[in-house]
Amino acid sequence: MLKKSIGIFYRCFYLNNKCDYYLIFLAPFSLFTQIFMVITALISVANSGQMSLIWFTNFDTFTYQSNSLAIFLVWYYFLNHKSRWFENSSLVLSVTGYLVFTVIFFNFYALSRFTGIVNIEPDVQGWFSTITTQLPYSFNGSFINDWNAFSELLLHVIHPLFYFIYVGLLFKTYKFIKPPRNLQSFLLKAGIYPSIYAFYLQTIPFLNVWDNGENSYSVYGFFTQTKYNSYVWIWSIPIFASMFLILWMLFVINNHYYGKKHHK
């Protein structure tokens, strides 16, 4: 019985190399991040009295979903590294692309706020959106403000950075993980989730969620308000296309790196 228990423990932790040792740190930290997101959503509910805010403004954001996918991937690999999903790098590249997109666009938004290029007025903030007048990453001593600031830092800098280190170690350590060979097939499969999410962004303002006749719920306020803002399509299409550009770049980098490793 003892030998069997030790065997199960060993299969779960596979302490064979740097990547496996790093997972001993990353797996619990990722779990902490997921719990932190749940607590943040519950705080939103407590402050507003709106139970629906567990989903709206929290788990319906690309930030929460891309981080959650990365957390799921880490734990799935941690517990089942021999799964057929890891026979090639398609899944890892896809999730990495989603998180890269999150990091780039939120930090671009943060930079635009700090430089004054974007100023958040009530009409930009929207109605129950994730856009607030609070500057990103700004701590001021208020519990709610500081909690939100740390949440932004955790989900847009700290956790993504630790995840990217894991991906780097994974590809450096396990040379047998083959890259996807067909770009069109890879983009088609990897693009399913962001396409569904984009459809959600475009349709939620029309579903009469907190609709007062002049504004309605939009995940990112003015920037995704398709019902009351006719200009939203100007930036929506290129932003959506940039997701596929990121996935294409990861595909090219991965194939080039894999080729170099196997022709030494």
From Swiss-Prot:
Q: Which InterPro entries match?
A: DUF1600
Q: Write out the GO cellular component annotations.
A: plasma membrane
Q: Does the keyword Transit peptide apply?
A: no
Tell me the membrane topology, using the record's own terms: Multi-pass membrane protein
Q: Which residues cross the membrane?
A: 23-43, 59-79, 91-111, 150-170, 190-210, 233-253
Q: Which UniProt keywords apply?
A: Cell membrane, Membrane, Transmembrane, Transmembrane helix
Pfam short name (any one): DUF1600
Q: What is its main location?
A: membrane
Task: Output the superkingdom of the source species.
Answer: Bacteria
What pairs make up the disulfide bonds? none
Q: What happens when the gene is disrupted?
A: Probably essential, it was not disrupted in a global transposon mutagenesis study.
**Cellular localisation:** Cell membrane
- What name goes with this protein? Uncharacterized protein MG133
Q: Which organism is it from?
A: Mycoplasma genitalium (strain ATCC 33530 / DSM 19775 / NCTC 10195 / G37)
